[in-house]
């Protein structure tokens, strides 16, 4: 890690405070810079679905990465292993399956699907299709 655990915890608290101000209960961050800022994750894997997921009351964010990139998450982040969420390679390029199908499953399993979810709308590789999967699973959501 390039920064201390205390630095990462302080960053998380700042983000969570801003989430409260904006009424966001769950933040899905796809931008690699922001993932690094929040978790320390540092890998050349931006071209596949990945994100940091911040719950407004959580002690740590989640890091959502494909199986092949999980090693980088275990090495470069401060996160507990249970907060590194790994999706199987069979979600990649197997239409109609998509990694965000698994992400939505995780959100539902944690009973976060009814929360006010915020996403970064200007991140490379976060496509309109990715957003539609989140919206399909959350029919009451507004863009």
Short names for language-model regions:
Residues 32, 65-68, 119-124:
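Structural motif
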Residues 89-96, 141:
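A short acidic, often aromatic-flanked loop/helix-cap motif at beta-alpha or helix-coil junctions
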Residues 1-59, 108:
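Terminal domain-start leader segments
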Residues 129-131:
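Rossmann-like NAD(P)H-binding beta-loop-alpha module
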Residues 134-143:
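Single conserved hydrophobic/aromatic residue that forms the stacking wall/gate
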Residues 62-91:
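Compact, glycine/acidic-enriched structural inserts
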Residues 95-125:
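Hydrophobic alpha-helical hairpins/lids featuring a short glycine-rich hinge
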Residues 27-30, 119, 137:
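General beta-strand structural signal in soluble alpha/beta enzymes
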């Amino acid at each position: 890690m390039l920064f201390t655990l205390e630095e990462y915890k302080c960053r998380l608290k700042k983000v969570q405070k801003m989430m409260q101000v904006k009424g966001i209960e769950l933040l899905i961050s796809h931008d690699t810079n922001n993932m690094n800022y929040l978790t320390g994750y540092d890998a050349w894997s931006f071209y596949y679905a990945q994100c940091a997921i911040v719950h407004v009351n959580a002690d740590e964010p989640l890091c959502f990465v494909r199986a092949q990139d999980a090693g980088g998450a275990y090495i470069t982040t401060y996160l507990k292993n249970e907060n590194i969420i790994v999706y199987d390679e069979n979600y990649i390029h197997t239409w109609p399956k998509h990694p965000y199908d698994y992400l939505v499953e995780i959100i539902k399993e944690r009973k976060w699907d009814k929360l006010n979810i915020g996403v970064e709308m200007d991140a490379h590789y976060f496509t309109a299709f990715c957003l539609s999967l989140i919206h399909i699973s959350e029919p009451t959501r507004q863009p």
